[in-house]
């Protein structure tokens, strides 16, 4: 069976959760391969509206195995809370449909505290962190200063390892930031409250995935955030601290030999962004407020108002290229229905020169948008269910974007519900 990756093409918040929720009926396994509790995937179904920060979006589909891979920042506190929320809606969560890689590293209480302390230290130079501990976590992971989930199964080893980490981390907290630090008793209490509830789900998911692959099962890799937030290929340093691109999915999932047959890139019909950094086509004032309200553009995790503007075709084409997208899902087309004409950022002007190539981050700060305008359709399209019934101006807009980014748009969403998706 074919494997698929669902990834963001832009800054994140493109609507990946609804696409995973829609497509999971075709797959046996859904794997999260990077990131932690710092971003949310919104899913709307007959049970309600859910913002999933760690759980794979396949949890709502009976018979689908959901896996948190070794590349994930395993935030036990957020995960336990999320599982309780899902269960309260009548969704079963057990090791029969959720597994956690024994090689996933734990995001510990001090990671979140260090994140907030560093943002406070940076003041007006902050990166716009969600303060969920992601950067300190990945920093520790690459310094080999974390606890792996598999260690939860070996309490004596875990306690000794934690004691070593505690001494070093308290030196940083106390001497660099002037913070209080932690005691061993506090950490043990945290482990007993949260990590103990995750322990039953810990397994050798790499072996499980290899067996699933050998048995011909189909696997979906669910990405978090978008290409422009990738640590290596994004707008550095205003990125996340992991690799969000599809090429990393097999590694972070725990199945490095996997072949990805299809990469579905998710693109919003306009631009939105949470956090700091260059955002070339940003709107301000009344125009921004109207688009933000129309699209309900507030962070799923933080609730922060998102920065918004017209679709950025330069950034989107770059995202398509680095993600290796083979198909595009264009979301929230219905939000643009109030516009008489739809603006698009077709190119950048940098130092008096026009370019359609996405520049190096230091140069991006100088970019100015070169705008074009497409006819609006000025009618509600949220009830449209076939491409043929779409207003001609809306179809023209989709085809214009498709040609500009160089990738087929196979899905167009006109609402948040499962059925509000048009397949081309």
Predicted region positions:
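Non-transmembrane, aqueous-exposed alpha-helical and coiled segments at domain scale
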Residues: 1-424
């Amino acid at each position: 069976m074919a494997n698929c990756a669902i990834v963001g093409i832009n800054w994140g918040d493109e609507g990946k959760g609804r696409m995973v929720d829609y497509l999971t009926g075709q797959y046996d396994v859904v794997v999260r391969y990077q990131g932690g509790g710092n971003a949310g995937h919104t899913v709307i179904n007959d049970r309600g509206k859910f913002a999933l920060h760690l759980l794979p979006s396949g949890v709502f589909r009976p018979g689908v195995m959901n896996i948190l891979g070794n590349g994930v920042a395993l935030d036990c506190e957020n995960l336990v809370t999320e599982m309780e929320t899902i269960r309260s809606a009548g969704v079963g969560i057990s090791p029969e449909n959720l597994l956690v890689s024994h090689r996933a590293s734990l995001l510990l209480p001090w990671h979140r505290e260090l994140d907030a302390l560093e943002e406070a230290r940076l003041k007006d130079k902050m990166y716009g962190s969600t303060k969920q501990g992601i950067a300190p976590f990945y920093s520790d992971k690459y310094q080999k200063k974390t606890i792996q989930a598999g260690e939860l199964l070996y309490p004596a080893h875990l306690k000794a390892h934690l004691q070593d980490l505690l001494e070093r981390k308290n030196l940083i907290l106390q001497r660099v930031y002037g913070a209080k630090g932690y005691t061993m008793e506090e950490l043990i209490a945290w482990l007993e409250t949260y990590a103990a509830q995750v322990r039953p789900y810990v397994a050798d998911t790499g072996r499980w995935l290899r067996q699933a692959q050998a048995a011909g099962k189909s696997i979906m890799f669910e990405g978090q955030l978008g290409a422009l937030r990738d640590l290596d290929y994004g707008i550095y340093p205003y990125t996340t601290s992991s690799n969000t691109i599809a090429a990393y999915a097999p590694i972070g999932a725990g199945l490095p030999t996997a072949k990805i047959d299809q990469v579905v890139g998710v693109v919003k019909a306009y631009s939105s962004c949470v956090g700091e950094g260059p955002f070339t086509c940003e709107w301000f004032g009344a125009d921004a407020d109207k688009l933000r309200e129309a699209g309900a553009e507030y962070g799923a995790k933080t609730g922060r108002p998102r920065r918004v503007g017209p679709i950025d075709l330069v950034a989107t084409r770059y995202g398509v290229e680095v993600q290796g997208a083979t198909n595009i899902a264009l979301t929230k087309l219905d939000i643009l229905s109030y516009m008489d004409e739809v603006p698009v950022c077709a190119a950048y002007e940098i130092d008096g020169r026009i370019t359609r190539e996405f520049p190096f981050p230091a140069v991006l700060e100088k970019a100015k948008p070169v705008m074009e305008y497409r006819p609006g359709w000025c009618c509600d399209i949220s009830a449209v269910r076939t491409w043929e019934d779409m207003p001609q101006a809306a179809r023209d807009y989709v085809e214009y974007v498709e040609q500009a980014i160089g990738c087929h748009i196979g899905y167009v969403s006109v609402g948040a519900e499962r059925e509000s998706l048009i397949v081309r």
